Amino acid sequence: VGKLQVTGWGNTRRITIIINDMKKTKIVATISDKRCEVEFLEKLYRAGMNVVRLNTAHQDMEQALKVVENVRKVSDNIAILIDTKGPEVRTMLMDEPMHVDRGETIYLTGDPELKMEGKLIHVSYPYFAEDIKVGDKVLVDDGDVELVVVEKKDHYLEMMVTNEAVIKNRKSVNVPGASLKLKSLSDKDRAFIDFAIDNNLDFIAHSFVRNKEDVMAIQAILDARGSKIKVIAKIENQEGVDNIDEILDYAYGVMVARGDLGIEIEAEKIPKIQRYIVKKCIESKKPVIIATQMLHTMIEHPRPTRAEISDIANAVYMGTDAIMLSGETAYGAYPEEAVTVMREVAEENEGTVPPDAGRSLVRINNEITAALARSAVKTALMLPIKAIVVDTLSGRTARYLSAFRSDLPVYARCYNERVMRELALSFGVYPYYTEKPMSRDEFMNDLPEMLMQNGIKADDYVVVVGGSFGHGKGASFIEVCKIGEIR
């Protein structure tokens, strides 16, 4: 990720990233308050981490704040993403674990007052018996226990156990294919959204997004407080997959959360769903993250399996913007090595993706910025171009260039540190920050120094995408320049 150089002139502060890590695929790393020392975070940053993820299922606000403060001591360039828990159902009111045998009959209810003979399990959703049908499968504890609905009663379900297991308190309950009337946001979620706003975080990844309304529920809170935090929709069930188009209309980006997705949907369908969602995100010019168990072996072992290496490479081949580590960096024994493996696999395999991969998917939708972005990428293919450079106020032009998946680096000059961090989730974009918005001449005259710091020579050519250099104008021109001749 290179060294951070801070320079300035007059009252203007400029941050220039000198990039040693030239992977285009971004890396998200989950960080726990149990291990978030500044030195540790610096190692992950140097290894290739672009975004820090906080998992609110395992942290309170004091613990999360500790991570945030330490990340900010490392670099303003690292984005911070916080997960909500989202709508979920869990077992509850169990004083002790319950052993169940294959073929045994047990009972499930959402009524906390219900008592009866036999093995009864309470769950945290009051309409459970109402929403579930005879024949539905109910999966407990991340799928370790499978139950089948045999008969429906007014306030409980009669279930048959299909495998011997032990059911414990506060374990997850999933019903593949069922549409439950769960609230999108819990009280804890709302509190953490306020925490994210108060601490100027960059992304909120909302769990179990089923439709546009789930995204809008968070956006309404953000809008009411004037927050610019971007919403990432975590797709974790069939309903989310089915409604991906409307979700993409309202979310900033998408995370393919394969853990719960693989419980809610048959595991053998996950690869094609992953490919489908990545394709949809590229079409919509929205960032996409592939997550869960990418280097699971490295939680305990220093080297990954060949299958894990292939999993990362396949995500790169599909054209994902980012890949994510969970337990590997949160509590695993080899966190720095895991980030390094991800970076090395991404770097090695990005160059083997066909030059036009995904490029034809992107929808222009009569947008001038999108048309210019496509023209810039096509121009770079036809000429001996070394880089694409963009001046961006909102980050939109840089994101659109990213969507066309150029095999050249896209250097994005940003005038807002939040925009710079938002681009930490965009494939192939290397954002850098300048406090003072520039005129066109200032922008062009400043390019040679930055580009040559990043290995581009005076006789190299670049494509410049720019606009009217004013708020709300957007990109309006592309220009091919020889670095040594810019005046």
Residue ranges and their predicted role:
Residues 19-487:
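Non-catalytic helical/linker scaffolds that mediate oligomerization, partner binding
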